[in-house]
């Protein structure tokens, strides 16, 4: 198995079908990849709805795991624990990908190189929303294989990329954090990453923006508390391992910025 695609989902709506349909349409041989869908914090009627949809519409290899414990980080951890692929791809359940997404990523990924795709933001009201990672892609993609920290903005989360299992090892998402755990996870595995390389423009991760999503419902007091804990954890990791100093500084600045703008 070359790739395991991990999708956490909680009380999914119709957008999950769009996500799964986009994977069903992948050009990469279906024998080379699997989907691990983790339904977290809920059960019925969503579990039966997913099972019925998969049976009626999909031919790809897909396993469904249900856990009563809610939380995207816990769901991703469960997905990794049950994944069979040499590479891991994370996709959020309200996003979707272009047909060549997996094939383009696997062609350029390596044991020390993260493969990253083009990305486009959208919403239910707008087909195209300006997105800072689209700008980052446009400015970095043509440079070819490059040190990972050259494209530091792409390391704010695990989506839009293909990650070798050896980079992850036993590392998992820290479930103690309500926000910022995506960036913390990417920092934690960065000692195993040397390079990043981008796909062509046709391999696209479509990022949906929704009002009231988990990353948006956040008070200032919570932001301050969570931000302080993140800074402490980043610093602990930095002094514990051989992390890039420049990359560490950018993560701390990112946390401070998120506190100020909250």
Q: For each predicted feature, which ranges?
A:
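Cell-envelope/extracellular polymer assembly enzymes that use nucleotide-activated donors
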Residues: 2-4, 34, 184
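A conserved hydrophobic helix/loop-capping motif in glycosyltransferases and polysaccharide synthases
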Residues: 3-15, 19, 26, 38
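Acidic donor-binding segment of Leloir-type glycosyltransferases
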Residues: 20-66
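Flexible acidic/His/Gly-enriched loops in nucleotide-sugar-dependent glycosyltransferase catalytic domains
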Residues: 59, 98-167
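Glycine-rich, basic loop-to-helix element that forms the pyrophosphate-binding segment
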Residues: 66-83
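Short aromatic/hydrophobic "clamp" motif used to bind/position activated sugar donors
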Residues: 88
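Conserved nucleotide-sugar donor-binding catalytic segment
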Residues: 143-220
């Amino acid at each position: 198995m070359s790739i395991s695609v991990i999708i956490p989902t909680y009380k999914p709506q119709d957008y999950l079908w769009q996500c799964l349909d986009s994977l069903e349409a992948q050009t990469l041989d279906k024998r080379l990849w699997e989907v691990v869908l983790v339904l977290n914090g809920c059960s019925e009627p969503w579990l039966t709805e997913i099972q019925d949809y998969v049976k009626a519409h999909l031919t790809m290899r897909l396993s469904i795991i249900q856990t009563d414990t809610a939380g995207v980080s816990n769901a991703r951890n469960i997905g990794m624990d049950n994944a069979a692929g040499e590479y891991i791809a994370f996709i959020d359940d309200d996003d979707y990908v272009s047909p060549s997404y997996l094939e383009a990523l696997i062609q350029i990924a390596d044991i020390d190189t993260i493969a990253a795709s083009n990305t486009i933001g959208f919403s239910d009201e707008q087909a195209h929303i300006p997105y800072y990672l689209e700008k980052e892609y446009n400015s970095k993609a043509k440079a070819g294989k490059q040190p990972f920290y050259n494209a530091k903005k792409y390391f704010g989360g695990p989506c839009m990329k293909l990650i070798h299992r050896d980079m992850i090892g036993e590392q998992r998402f820290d479930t103690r954090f309500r926000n910022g755990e995506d960036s913390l996870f990417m920092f934690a595995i960065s000692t195993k990453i040397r390079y990043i390389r981008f796909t062509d423009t046709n391999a696209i991760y479509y990022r949906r923006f929704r009002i009231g999503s988990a990353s948006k419902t956040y008070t200032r007091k919570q932001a301050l508390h969570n931000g302080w804990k993140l800074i402490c954890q980043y610093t602990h990791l930095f002094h514990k391992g051989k992390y890039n100093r420049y990359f560490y500084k950018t993560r701390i600045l990112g946390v401070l910025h998120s506190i100020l703008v909250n």
